[in-house]
């Protein structure tokens, strides 16, 4: 049986293949194989997918000779006797439930109930907000790692090991798993790859495998190697290393488990490419569709923008008469182009400044205030998520700032120590809103312990008893809303988000104010989400915002600013 490296070497050479291979590197997906369409995702995705400039990497290649597997079509075997997972580890179809909306001017929705129109608007709105890059760490319930943990617990794999080790062996669980793996392999193929589809269906013919299992001679190791070789043909360059690592696993159960996990990553690669391919179309259609639907509602309800007008009026008033706490805005500056501190100058006003202040106010919105802007109702769940994320970052940055002020500078110059402390703090502050005092007590204990261990491991001077007690007290005081450190950090994060809205995320990261440098990566993620949400909303409702802001900003102020319009 040829190993993975030999199998990969048998790929047919060609210009497109060479170009794809030469272009690999990092996490960038440059191969069309990373964008494999599936029948499950639908032919719409395949048609919408632009051809890769690198050409097809895999799929039109010859595979190694198959072993003694049977012939025949795909059939299901008898009911498995193995423990059934609560839900199969299948990734949902990207396009189902989120079709490209029709042009708003063609009247496809004319005569339908208003509830149906609102539902369609929300579906289009949600489809346009799909993240361009899904990752395992952000998909605890949708990633393969999460699926294996949730739906195929360790007792399944233990039971599979017991069955294969029995005399005679029981292959019922193995057959179920092979059937699942076969379906995933088929889902990674493009419709035109009929030859590979026929080969997979022939090599993993469930009826023939059931016959082998009944005779007690099902070769699980051989089938695993065949699946591994097929994965070499289908995976994106970024997954080559993971696939080749599986070659060194001799235990059949561990190998099957590894295969199942990597196949899930390959499906995620395909989902990401599909999202990236459809994103521009979804956004373009969404802006037109949402605006047309809102205008239709506005024609029937002339007072529909009352809450939106009040929201923007409050934002403009805040900028004209800023609070004393706004003096901290000067901490944000940038050497590239206009500095973020320029953004915070209260006069002259600009539409962009008022709108950015309005968006920031939504992150501190009183849940009992029912006068939520009508133009942002669909975005309210996402704004609440951003508010929660921003609040946790405020606590995290406050903890790091206080801890660093009591420690030797060399300790917080260690990325390993900072990362460890951040992970510990993040896990503890998840329940901060429900029990702040209790959470901060746990945080103070853990942080003090980590600081002591870090200082000792680096040969630095230990904290005195007095400093330790002071550190614990200041960390626990972060639980209070009026805590000075917490208030300053909160203001600076809000300023950073305002800078992101006006200047962009990258320019806003160039010169972070004190206390935020240790959470730069987390701020970049938060800023990108905030900008993505607010800019889409601005694209949809810019005509309405412009008309409202004309009544709030004098023409002289508008002319005095470069951002005179949205």
Swiss-Prot record:
In terms of InterPro entries, this protein maps to: Tcp11
Keywords (A to Z) from UniProt: Cell projection, Cilium, Cytoplasmic vesicle, Developmental protein, Differentiation, Flagellum, Membrane, Phosphoprotein, Spermatogenesis, Transmembrane, Transmembrane helix
| Chain positions with Phosphoserine modification | 103
* UniProt xrefs under Pfam families: Tcp11
Let me know which tissues express this protein, per UniProt.
Testis-specific. Expressed in mature epididymal spermatozoa (at protein level).
Predominant place of localization: membrane
Task: Describe its function.
Answer: Plays a role in the process of sperm capacitation and acrosome reactions. Probable receptor for the putative fertilization-promoting peptide (FPP) at the sperm membrane that may modulate the activity of the adenylyl cyclase cAMP pathway.
- According to UniProt, the name of this protein is T-complex protein 11
The organism named in the record is Mus musculus
């Amino acid at each position: 049986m040829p190993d993975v490296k030999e199998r990969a070497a048998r790929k047919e050479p060609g210009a497109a293949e060479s170009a794809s291979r030469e272009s690999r590197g990092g996490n960038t997906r440059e191969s069309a194989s990373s964008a494999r369409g599936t029948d499950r995702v639908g032919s719409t995705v395949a048609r919408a997918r632009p051809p890769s400039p690198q050409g097809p990497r895999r799929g039109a290649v010859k595979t190694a000779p198959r072993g003694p597997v049977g012939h025949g079509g795909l059939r299901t075997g008898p009911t498995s006797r193995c423990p059934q997972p609560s839900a199969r580890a299948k990734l949902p179809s990207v396009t189902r439930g989120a079709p490209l909306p029709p042009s708003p001017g063609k009247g496809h929705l004319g005569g339908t109930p208003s509830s149906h129109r609102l539902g369609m608007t929300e579906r289009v709105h949600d489809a346009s907000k799909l993240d361009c890059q899904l990752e395992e760490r952000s998909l605890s319930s949708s990633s393969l790692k999460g699926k294996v943990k949730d739906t195929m617990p360790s007792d399944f794999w233990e039971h599979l090991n017991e069955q294969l080790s029995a005399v005679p062996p029981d292959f019922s669980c193995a057959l179920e798993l092979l059937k699942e793996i076969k379906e995933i392999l088929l889902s990674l193929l493009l419709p035109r790859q009929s030859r590979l589809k026929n080969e997979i269906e022939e090599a993993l013919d469930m009826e023939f495998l059931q016959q082998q299992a009944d005779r007690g001679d099902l070769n699980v190791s051989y089938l695993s190697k065949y699946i591994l070789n097929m994965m070499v043909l289908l995976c994106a360059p970024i997954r080559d290393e993971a696939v080749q690592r599986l070659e060194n696993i001799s235990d059949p159960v561990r190998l099957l488990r590894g295969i199942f996990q990597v196949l899930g990553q390959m499906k995620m690669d395909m989902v990401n490419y599909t999202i990236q391919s459809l994103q521009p179309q979804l956004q373009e259609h969404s802006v037109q569709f949402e605006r047309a639907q809102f205008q239709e509602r506005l024609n029937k309800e002339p007072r529909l923008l009352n809450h939106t007008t009040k929201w923007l009026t409050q934002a403009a008033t805040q900028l004209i008469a800023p609070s004393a706490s706004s003096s901290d805005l000067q901490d944000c500056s940038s050497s590239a182009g206009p500095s973020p501190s320029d953004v915070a100058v209260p006069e002259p006003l600009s539409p962009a400044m008022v709108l950015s202040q309005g968006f920031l106010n939504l992150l501190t919105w009183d849940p009992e205030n029912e006068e939520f802007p009508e133009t942002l109702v669909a975005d309210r769940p996402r704004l609440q998520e951003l508010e929660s994320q921003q609040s946790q970052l405020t606590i995290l940055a406050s903890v790091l700032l206080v801890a660093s002020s009591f420690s030797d500078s060399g300790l917080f110059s260690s990325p390993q120590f900072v990362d460890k402390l951040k992970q510990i703090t993040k896990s503890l502050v998840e329940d901060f809103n429900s029990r702040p005092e209790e959470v901060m007590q746990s945080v103070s204990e853990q942080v003090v312990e980590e600081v002591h261990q870090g200082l000792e491991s680096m040969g630095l001077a230990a904290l005195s008893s007095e400093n330790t007690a002071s550190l614990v007290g200041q960390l626990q005081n972060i639980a209070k809303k009026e805590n000075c450190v917490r208030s300053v950090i909160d203001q600076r994060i809000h300023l950073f988000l305002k800078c992101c809205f006006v200047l962009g995320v990258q320019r806003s990261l160039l010169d972070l104010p004190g206390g935020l440098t240790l959470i730069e990566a987390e701020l970049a993620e938060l800023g990108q989400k905030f900008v993505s949400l607010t800019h889409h909303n601005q694209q949809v409702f810019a005509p309405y915002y412009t008309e409202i802001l004309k009544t709030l900003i004098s023409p002289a102020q508008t002319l005095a600013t470069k951002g005179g319009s949205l």
